[in-house]
Each structure stands twice: as structure tokens, then as C-alpha cells.
Amino acid sequence: MNEIIRNTQSSVTNGSLDPQDWSEFRALAHRMLDETIDGIANIRSRPVWQPIPDGVRAALKSDVPRGASELAEVYREFAEHVAPYATGNVHPGFMGWVHGGGTAVGMLAEMLAAGLNANLGGRDHMPIEVERQIVGWMRSLFAFPDSASGIFVTGTSMANLMAVLVARTAALGTLARQHGIGNDGALLAAYTSRAAHGCVSRAMDIAGLGADALRKVDVDVDHRIDVAALRAQIAADREIGFKPFLVVASAGTVDIGAIDDLRAVAQLCREEGIWFHVDGAFGALAILSPELAPLLGGIELADSIALDFHKWGQVPYDAGFLLVRDGEQHRQAFAQPAAYLSREARGLAAGTVWPCDLGPDLSRGFRALKTWFTLKTFGTDRLGAVIARSCALAKYLEARILAEPRLELLAPVNLNIVCFRYRAGDAVNREVVADIQESGIAAPSSTTLDGKFAIRAAIANHRTEETDIDALVAAVLKFGAQRSGGVTEVEAPPLAAQ
């Protein structure tokens, strides 16, 4: 026995993964932090995005690293091969998708969370109280009752899926979790607009209800769900035996940022006894802006709301969130008894409702900390002003487009998304988008509206200024002229000074 103990002790000598020289580690850590801060502070000196050279991709590929490497060498690889070729959404010229720019504050909070290495699946510790505090703040902002529940998730795609599952359980009862959806589940029907994000259809698929069970309702002239058409579709489905159980309204559609008439949809859902969910991935946080909040009238009547703090909230990725009006219905959709998850009257396992009772994950990172730091450090008033500013910049871009005969506005500007094109064919505009991205000047994206290829600018970065909008317009005119055989140099109209 003693020999076994001695052999075991020998095998675990120096088994800790902590640094052998903390002073050396501290110096390198400070250098990493300083260089990361420098990268954010001097972001304008870099291209928004740049293509990844084949050599860089090849340099990252290697066999399984069975032996140790010096941390400094690993960091060198990161600094040379990873950091310069990121998505680019820290840069103020990034306007491709609704990606928040992050903040230095959020970066520090992420580091602190990693230092704690807390699992927020459950048990009794203060990191969970931080998450619960944010749930309380969201209840207050959206005028939800004290009994409402909330949980952090990866993003709104997951939050929408979870909302579908909560609504499904509310419609079929908890036995459906044990026995499956059965014949009753096969008759469930959900509704959203044709302009809704594709993740809603995907949620129906993953939930086992099928994408065909999602009725995509036409939009009106303002690109909002046609409430009259929605009412008619619900009536038609009931007539042939379907059970309408869910309506997903959009607070900021993916293509142009339109907000459905939430109050009218809420009223219809109340009359019909249907779960009313709002996909507010980015638009829901307009609640922080006094001038934009009225656009969300009716969101306070929702049964559930999905949103992303990593979009307009500027929290580093990822930080999605689901808020549910009826906390007990939320719990019934996910809670599962297990001996290893038993609750005790005292000790580390104390508590009643744990986050794992409100979602599918037992292993959960401390997403709430960077959100808590962001909300506490900047305050909701300042974040609301940033959100309003991004919408003002979108209107500025709209004015630039309307003042330039070579550009065409393709949709009304509702919030922070602008869809337009160079007055040429789709092929030219498709090349223009790629040209601009590869130039590093800006990073727009694209979509298709009414059969036309559109250049899509989604302004979500708190660092973006009018000069960045001017640079985008100038780039579109320059590359559009080159691709269409026109003039290559264009002086942009000086609307910024007006």
C-alpha cells in the first residue's frame, strides 16, 4: 500500500497547471492586457476586415500539441495569426451585421469572470445573484411582474428556441415533455412575418414541431406583420383543426429593422389565447432610449422577450437573454429532478430555482458579469443615447443616399439599418460589397429586397461617426464607378456640415 501511495505521489509531482514563475507570468499577462487595450484604443489604424492569406491559415494548422509550449510563443501565434484577422466588429467601420462593438470595460469583466471560473448552472453563490439582478432590471425596464423569470443564453437564436419550447409546454402541458408532442402537437401552429429572422423557423424545426408548422404572414407597406392577415390565417387554421399556440413578433426585422405593431399583435394574442413572443434581438434594447422606446409600445404585454446584450448593449460576445412573464411556466418547460441536482436547506446546494431549471444547460459561464459591468459602468441613459445615436447615423446615411443620384434607397429607414444600392445591376453591387470589405475601408453586408440585391449597412458600433458613413458612401461610389465603367473618383456631398 505504501508503495502505491509513493508511486501516486511521484506521478502527480508538479501536476498543477499554475505558472511555475508567477512573476514572469504576471509580466507577460500585463503585456497581453496592454496590447489588447492598445488594439482597441487604436482600432482606426487597422483595416475593418482583411482577407486571410493562405499562409496564415496554413501556419495555424498543426498536429495535436502533446508537448508543452511556452505561453509567450502561444501568444505570439495569436497576435500574428488570429488577432489581425477577426470579424472586425470592434472597428467603427463595421456595418455588415448588427454586431455590437464591445467595450474595454466588457473585456475586463470577461477576464474577471474567467478568473472566477464559476459555473452558473446552479447552487448558492454570488455570480448567480448577479444574473438574478439583471433579470430584475429587465423586469423593471419591460414592466414585467415580479414573478417573471429570465436567463442568459448564447444569443437570441437560442432564446427564441427556448421561447418556442416554453410556449409548446404551455399549450400541451408538462406530460408532453415525457411522452412527446403526440397528435395534439402535430396540430400546433405558430405565426410570424415573412420578414422575421430565419432562426424562428429553425426553432420550430429543432423543437420537433416542424418548420411547416410556422405560418409566414405577409407584411404591410411598412414591412410590419399584417395584423389583419395574421387574424385571418389564425381563423383559417382553427377552421381546419389546427391549434394556434404562438405568435412571434419582430422588434427590429433582420433586413431593414422594422418593428411590428406589438400592441395590436398583443391584443390579438390575448383574444385568441395564444402565446405572444417578441424577437427583440437588437431592437428590444431601444427601450433604453426615451425617443425610441415608444416604437416598442406593446412589448410590455409580451409573454416572453428575446434579446441580445451583445448587439446594441455593446457587451462582448456572447450575451443573449430570455425574459418570461410567467416564471412558473418557464420552469415547467425545463426543470428536471435529479439526485445530483437536489436542493438543500443550507450549504452550497441551497436555493430553490436554479438557472438550470430555466434552460437546457447545466454548464453555464458567467455571461452576466460583463453585462452587469456594462450596465453599471455606463448606465442605461448613456447606452440609450448610444442607441439613439446609431439611428441618427442611419438617417444621416439615408440623407447621403437621397442626395446622390447614383445611389438608390431600397427601404425605409426604421432604426439603424439602411438598405441601398449603386444604380447598376445586381452583379455590380455584389462585387461592390466584396470590394469594400476587402479594401478594409468598411464592412457592409447584403440582402435581397423585392428581388433586388441590396447593400445593407447596420450601424451598431458605439464608435461609429459621420466620417465613417462618409467613407462608406465614398467607397460605394468609387467601386461602383469602377465596376460599372464610370468615374472612379467621387467627391461626397458635404451633408455632415449641415
Q: Which residues make up each language-model segment?
A:
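Short beta-strand-to-loop capping motifs
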Residues: 324, 420-424, 459-461
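Conserved PLP-enzyme active-site core in the AAT-like
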Residues: 126, 159-331, 498
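Short loop-beta-helix segment that forms the pyridoxal 5′-phosphate
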Residues: 138-166, 215-218
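Conserved PLP cofactor-binding pocket of PLP-dependent enzymes
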Residues: 412, 417, 439-456
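Active-site C-terminal subdomain of aminotransferase-like
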Residues: 253, 272, 297-402
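PLP-dependent enzyme catalytic core of the Aspartate aminotransferase-like
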Residues: 449-498
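Conserved PLP-binding catalytic core of the aspartate aminotransferase-like
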Residues: 408-436
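N-terminal entrance/gating region of PLP-dependent enzymes' catalytic architecture
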Residues: 3-147, 434, 453, 464, ...
